[in-house]
């Protein structure tokens, strides 16, 4: 059993992960701007403040905090918020851990499959592939670099590159469940995905096995925008149309952010499967059936 501190613990993944960790007998503390529960502690990036009680006898930190990539159009200011919310928060954690002379057993950080860049190709990306040259690649690269500084404190560091997280409430699926379901753009871009339970189980595995390095947390079954949408329509008993939402409409609606809807490649799960990680929901149909 371990004492675990989570940032972003009140979000979609953090809430589920906290529940699963506690069921295993771990003690979980959550950093939040507005603490309400006994296990929640205040932090404020704007003033570089963290309640030091949160670090008492801590073993692991799981860093999930970060402004939503797809919540708002990518203005210059919004891009800065997206990066700073991930990097500055990791820097503040590092400063506090060093200042308090804490011997961490591990630092686990979220990242995204956007590390490889938002592009559509026939290449299947593995963890050793180079970082993408676009904005998503920049975000993930800086995010991961901020996490890797914990290696200087002799703490094992792992980064979890995550695809679309499938959950019953909130997240991408909520926005995709439109009255009529269709693919986006030309429909041929791939959508790396993972069921929230599998994702949380991998975070737990990272702790229990003291994993180090980068890992693609994606399900092994590949889907394009069209095949994903068709499977979603069947699972939710909603009509599916073969006519995709045109790219130009998405670009008008979302600006540069539309790239995350219109581009995507396959991402390999082989590394985590080779570690013996077993997906509870390896196929999209079974994942959606459980959720709906």
Where are these regions (language model features)?
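NAD(P)H-binding glycine-rich loop region in Rossmannoid oxidoreductase-like domains
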Residues: 43-92
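Conserved beta-loop-beta element that borders a ligand/cofactor-binding pocket
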Residues: 111, 145-168
